[in-house]
Each structure stands twice: as structure tokens, then as C-alpha cells.
């Protein structure tokens, strides 16, 4: 995803990245393949890129709802406003992490945000428990991409890894404690991706 310095102030704030980091330069997020975000490739008749629409910075609400449904009983239902709230939260979280990663790139005078930058940002922002599992996932992802590129198919590698993290992977439950406003602790179930389905990757353990 390429963010050019020509983007408007409103667009930059929507993405959670200040103008100081993108003014006069651009940052590129590359997943080690040549695939580009088609959204940024659309140009109007004057040759300028279209402004981001609000829905363009959100994950598809159907995908968000599908993940949410995995965390509730089969008979449970989720209201539309709840789905929209989580959809916006996910977008804010992505912008939050990416903004921190872009700051590191800015300090090191780089223009490409890589996987290590994201891991560094998550650690800096207090998401340490996710860093080690994500390091292993990133390693496996790169190995898969490298292996498939060697036999002529980066897309196949991505598809193959996606199959290992398919929808049914969100079935494992991890016990966790939830501290309520009155100081009481409640037991809840946290649904996470089945990291053990990828060789060498372990589940996140909550204490």
C-alpha cells in the first residue's frame, strides 16, 4: 500500500499517520511479493488518484462479523452496530500499529515498512505477548513465499498458507481473566488462530 505525500490532510488523519511522516515522501508496505493494492491504482480521468472513501479503510464487515461469530455460541446473534463498532476498532488498531512502524522507518530514513517494523511497533506499544508467535509466523510465511517462488508461484504460496489459517482455525479456546470495573475477575474464553497448525508456531499463552 503506497501513501504518497500528495494525500490530503483528511486522508492522512483517517489513516492515523501524521503529515510529518508522509510529507514530501511516501511509505510502502510490501509483503515480499509484487502484489500491489489495486485500490491505489485507480485513477480518475485527470490522472490523479481517487480520495479514500471511509469504507475503503475498513475491513469488509462480512469478514469482521464472521470472526466475531466464532467467539459466541452458535445460537448467538450480533447487532449491526456492534459489527460496525468492531470494524472501526480493527481499522484504528491497524493504523495505530502502522503509524508506530512508520515512525521507526522515518527515524532510520527508510521508506519501506517491513515485518520487523510491525513486530517492533507491537512490542513498543505493549503487545509483547503477540511478538514471539508473530515472529514464527513471519518466518514461516517468508519460507513459504521463497519456496513457492523458486518453483514459479508466489500466489500459490500465499494461498497455501491461507489454507492453514482458514476459518476453522479460529476454534481453539484459551482461558483468560477479565477484570471488570468493580474489580471482580470473570473467566472468559479467548479465541485465537491455531498456530500449532503451522509447524514450529506455538499458541499465545495468557497468564
From Swiss-Prot:
Which GO biological process annotations does it have? Answer: regulation of transcription by RNA polymerase II
Q: Please tell me where this protein is predominantly located.
A: nucleus
Task: Specify the cross-link site (Glycyl lysine isopeptide (Lys-Gly) (interchain with G-Cter in ubiquitin)).
Answer: 140
Region annotation (Disordered) maps to 27-52
Q: Where is the composition biased (Basic and acidic residues)?
A: 39-52
Span list, region C domain:
143-207
Q: How is the quaternary structure described?
A: Heterotrimeric transcription factor composed of three components, NF-YA, NF-YB and NF-YC. NF-YB and NF-YC must interact and dimerize for NF-YA association and DNA binding. Interacts with C1QBP.
The protein, known as: Nuclear transcription factor Y subunit beta
Q: Which organism is it from?
A: Equus caballus
Amino acid at each position: 500500500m503506497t501513501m504518497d505525500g500528495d494525500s490530503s490532510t483528511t486522508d492522512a488523519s483517517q489513516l492515523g499517520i501524521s503529515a510529518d511522516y508522509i510529507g514530501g515522501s511516501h511509505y510502502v508496505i510490501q509483503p515480499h511479493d509484487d502484489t500491489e493494492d489495486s485500490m491505489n491504482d485507480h485513477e480518475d480521468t485527470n490522472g490523479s488518484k481517487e480520495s479514500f472513501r471511509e469504507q475503503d479503510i475498513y475491513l469488509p464487515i462480512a469478514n469482521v462479523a464472521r470472526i466475531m461469530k466464532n467467539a459466541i455460541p452458535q445460537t448467538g446473534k450480533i447487532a449491526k452496530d456492534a459489527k460496525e463498532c468492531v470494524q472501526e476498532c480493527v481499522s484504528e488498531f491497524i493504523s495505530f500499529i502502522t503509524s508506530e512502524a512508520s515512525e521507526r522507518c522515518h527515524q532510520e530514513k527508510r521508506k519501506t515498512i517491513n515485518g520487523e517494523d510491525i513486530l517492533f511497533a507491537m512490542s513498543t506499544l505493549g503487545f509483547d505477548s503477540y511478538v514471539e508467535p508473530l515472529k514464527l509466523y513471519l518466518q514461516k510465511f517468508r519460507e513459504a513465499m521463497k519456496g513457492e517462488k523458486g518453483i514459479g508461484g508466489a500466489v500459490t504460496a500465499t494461498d497455501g498458507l491461507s489454507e492453514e489459517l482458514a476459518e476453522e482455525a479460529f476454534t481453539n479456546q484459551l482461558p483468560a481473566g477479565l477484570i471488570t470495573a468493580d474489580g471482580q475477575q470473570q473467566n472468559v474464553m479467548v479465541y485465537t488462530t491455531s498456530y500449532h497448525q503451522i509447524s514450529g508456531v506455538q499458541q499465545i499463552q495468557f497468564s
